[in-house]
């Protein structure tokens, strides 16, 4: 019996080629897109879950607020004290580890690389995190102060096929460190991404227990069954008691325990170890995946029910011949299952050939290998059953319920209920399409606005070179030579790249303020040409001078006196105008000096946040050189700078990037989501138009005789096209009216995440509506024009 059902179903699919092809095409595209998005979402959601103790590992976020801060700050970095202190104080904590950046040039024989993913970590690192060892012992790998653990790719880079264990690498041209372990390359879905982990046992920094100067990434391993909130409360009670005098004065700090598996998508802390995702974008893309699948199913459902009238005679004959409703239901479900199976296979093929494109698009390495094989099989079976049920159940019930007498008499017509359902489904499809069109345009406009917004910094054509930590004397020597090169306008230096500037500084003394005054600020040690190089505009006062550099680098720390340049936001937070700020004395984390100048507000950080108070001062130690180029013959300029660098510091590889790239990287999550949304907006339009075209085919077939009569009576081609297309265009207009307020609300909420944002313009809704109507008109007109141009005699004959 089943074999007969399958043969009959296949014959019907072949006979009804148009319906079958449109159904398969729509379902295949919908399923393929669903698989692509599901794979992307799986990759995002599995971050850090490969660790054996993932559910017990907590990242410590550091929160602080002074009495004069408008709001609290939350950062992913902590001082050195929390991990060793809380391990000792709280029995609920089984272990803990601190990680700190240690980017330095590393050399083995004639191989020299500037390692960007080099960290120092406490000994328990590999006991807490489950990175798989290929060589060495995880329990003791970081016990020795000079120990290094490297990834398999790093081992191959330095040693080829030789055994890496016991090999000695020279770090920063002075420190010998021995390889004690080799681990598998870190998975892409790990927020701790490293190439080299060194022992921090020999670091003076790691031996300290400071509660200020946050630079470490801290993780705690809780004992099984421990309540996270209880541990967090005990930690914060301890801190409140230790610093009760500071708390009375309004300066507070507290810690938040963030489950490791939540860090990538849910953490709000700034300065993460690696760029974070956003759980809201996961929800959005998850909804897009489901909606695309629903659109494809709706398409199929619409086409089958519309086609039902043409199958009425077949159903009537089979019922008269004794076919039960259950048998007809089974027949139609098998037809749906066959279309779903073909569509699923086609969708898998489309997904497979699209993975490379989608990987480039999304910035992740995606493919069927992302899935566990058994998971993939179960997912595809579930998808097959779900789509068959969604797309096949109603049409099967609908078709098998036809009255055989009515169908055999040829009196089966479109019922009002059937028409209403099909209209509702068309409206649903175009509501989705118009909604995505509006959202895509607004999101794109916001991202373009951010990219071109004047943030007070001239970031264009600024090279950033990682110098690995150099004195002011060395920096000035190099910069003096570089500025003589054609194509170089200015050169300066800073402790960090402007984009990586951390908070954690406080102005704890200022003229005219109480002794307990404390204002949290962002601070940046810079070389005196920093303002000129980045085009920062002085609104009051003077730039740094040679005297400032001399005073701030005095060998006797007690004699150091700093010149400070602050931004307008800092002056306002201090209660001063720009004019009043000049000459005022302030204290910054133990540094004392006076305000030399006030610059126009500028933004180093993401435009999700407001501009913060910023303080700049000269110092004697720098990690980055910034070179402003003219932009003319940039390749030649880079080559010349590289030549100077090689002569100046042959022990450190020349590596550079451009500052505007760093700024763009801050919005990768938004750009990625926007790009994905744009691509799948086009897919929703395609699926909607595919369904609309199929319905137009059936609609014109039902109105063949009417069209013929109208032509005989003198109707023009335009009037017939208008007649056939009009009903569909009304549905699209209704869709625009429904989608517009929903899209406005969604994008209004999204824009609230940005401190600097566009206003939503009415033209976006008008343009999206016009595009949707135009696309629908073109889609339907292809078929209605064909009907209008058909010989009326032929139309009247076919209508008999």
Descriptions of predicted regions:
Residues 3-11, 15, 19, 51, ...:
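Membrane-helix entry/capping segments
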Residues 15-41, 277-313, 341, 421-446, ...:
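Hydrophobic alpha-helical transmembrane segments of multi-pass inner-membrane transport and secretion
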Residues 29-58, 354-363, 432-460, 750-757:
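Alpha-helical transmembrane segments
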Residues 35, 42-65, 92, 132, ...:
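Membrane-proximal juxtamembrane linkers immediately C-terminal to transmembrane helices
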Residues 44, 58-114, 124, 156-161, ...:
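Hydrophobic, regular-secondary-structure patches
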Residues 122-135, 148-277, 477-669:
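Mid-to-C-terminal secondary-structure elements
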């Amino acid at each position: 019996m089943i074999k007969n059902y399958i043969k009959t179903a296949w014959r019907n699919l072949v006979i009804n080629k148009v319906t079958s092809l449109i159904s398969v095409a729509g379902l295949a595209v919908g399923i393929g897109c669903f698989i692509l998005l599901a794979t992307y979402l799986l990759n995002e959601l599995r971050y850090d879950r490969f660790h054996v103790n993932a559910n017990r590992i907590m990242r410590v976020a550091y929160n602080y607020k002074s009495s004069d801060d408008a709001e609290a700050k939350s950062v992913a970095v902590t001082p050195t004290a929390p991990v060793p202190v809380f391990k000792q104080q709280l029995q609920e904590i089984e272990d803990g580890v601190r990680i700190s950046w240690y980017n330095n040039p590393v050399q083995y024989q004639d191989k020299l690389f500037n390692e960007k993913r080099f960290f120092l970590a406490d000994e328990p690192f590999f006991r807490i995190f489950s990175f798989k060892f290929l060589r060495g012992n995880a329990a003791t790998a970081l016990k020795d102060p000079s120990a290094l653990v490297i990834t398999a790719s790093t081992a191959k880079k330095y040693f080829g096929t030789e055994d890496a264990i016991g090999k000695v690498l020279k770090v920063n041209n002075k420190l010998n460190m021995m390889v004690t372990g080799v681990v598998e390359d870190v998975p892409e879905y790990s927020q701790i991404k490293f190439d080299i982990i060194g022992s921090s046992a020999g670091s003076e920094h790691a031996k300290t227990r400071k509660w200020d100067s946050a630079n470490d990434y801290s993780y705690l391993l809780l004992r099984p069954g421990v309540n996270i909130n209880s541990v967090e409360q005990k930690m914060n009670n301890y801190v409140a008691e230790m610093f009760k005098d500071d708390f009375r004065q309004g300066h507070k700090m507290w810690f938040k325990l963030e489950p490791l598996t939540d860090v990538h998508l849910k953490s709000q802390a700034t300065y993460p170890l690696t760029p974070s995702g956003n759980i809201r974008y996961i929800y959005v893309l998850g909804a897009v995946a489901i909606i695309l699948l629903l659109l494809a199913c709706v398409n199929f459902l619409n086409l089958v029910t519309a086609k039902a009238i043409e199958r009425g005679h077949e159903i009537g004959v089979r019922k008269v011949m004794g076919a039960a409703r259950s048998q007809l239901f089974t027949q139609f479900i098998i037809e749906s299952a066959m279309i779903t199976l073909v569509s699923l296979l086609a969708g898998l093929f489309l997904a497979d050939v699209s993975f490379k494109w989608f990987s480039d698009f999304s910035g992740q390495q995606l493919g069927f290998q992302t899935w566990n094989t058994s998971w993939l099989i179960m997912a595809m079976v579930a998808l097959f059953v779900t789509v068959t049920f969604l797309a096949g159940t109603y049409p099967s019930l609908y078709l098998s319920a036809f009255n055989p007498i009515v169908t055999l008499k040829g009196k089966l017509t479109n019922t009002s209920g059937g028409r209403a359902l099909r209209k509702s489904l068309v409206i649903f499809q175009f509501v989705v399409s118009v909604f995505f069109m509006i959202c895509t345009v607004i999101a794109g406009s916001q991202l373009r606005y951010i990219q071109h917004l004047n943030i007070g910094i001239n970031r264009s054509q600024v090279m950033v070179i990682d110098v690995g930590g150099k004195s002011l004397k060395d920096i000035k020597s190099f910069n003096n030579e570089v500025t003589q090169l054609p194509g170089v306008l200015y050169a300066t230096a800073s402790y960090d790249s402007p984009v990586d500037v951390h908070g954690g500084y406080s102005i704890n003394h200022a003229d005219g303020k109480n002794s307990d005054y404390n204002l949290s600020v962002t601070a940046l040690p810079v070389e005196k040409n920093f303002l000129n190089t980045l085009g920062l505009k002085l609104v009051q006062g003077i730039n740094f001078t040679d005297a400032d550099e001399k005073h701030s680098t005095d060998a006797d720390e007690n004699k150091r006196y700093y010149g400070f340049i602050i931004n307008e936001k800092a002056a306002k937070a201090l209660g001063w105008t720009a004019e009043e700020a000049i000459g005022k004395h302030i204290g910054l984390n133990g540094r004392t000096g006076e305000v030399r100048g006030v610059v126009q507000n500028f933004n180093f950080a993401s435009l999700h946040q407001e501009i913060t108070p910023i303080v700049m001062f000269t110092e004697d130690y720098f990690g980055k050189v910034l070179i402003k180029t003219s932009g003319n013959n940039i390749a030649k300029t880079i080559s010349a700078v590289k030549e100077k660098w090689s002569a100046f510091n042959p022990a450190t590889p020349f590596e550079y990037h451009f500052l505007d790239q760093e700024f763009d990287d801050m919005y990768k999550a938004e750009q990625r989501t926007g790009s994905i949304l744009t691509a799948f907006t086009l897919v929703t339009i395609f699926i909607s138009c595919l369904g609309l075209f199929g319905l137009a085919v059936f609609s014109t077939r039902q109105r063949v005789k009417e069209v013929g009569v109208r032509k005989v009576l003198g109707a023009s081609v335009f009037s017939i096209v208008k007649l056939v297309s009009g009903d569909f265009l009304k549905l699209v207009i209704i869709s625009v009216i429904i989608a517009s307020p929903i899209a406005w609300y969604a994008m209004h909420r999204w824009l609230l995440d940005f401190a600097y944002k566009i206003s939503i313009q009415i033209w976006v809704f008008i343009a999206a509506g016009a595009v949707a109507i135009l696309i629908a008109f073109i889609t339907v007109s292809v078929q209605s024009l064909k009907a209008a141009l058909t010989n009326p005699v032929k139309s009247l004959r076919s209508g008999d």
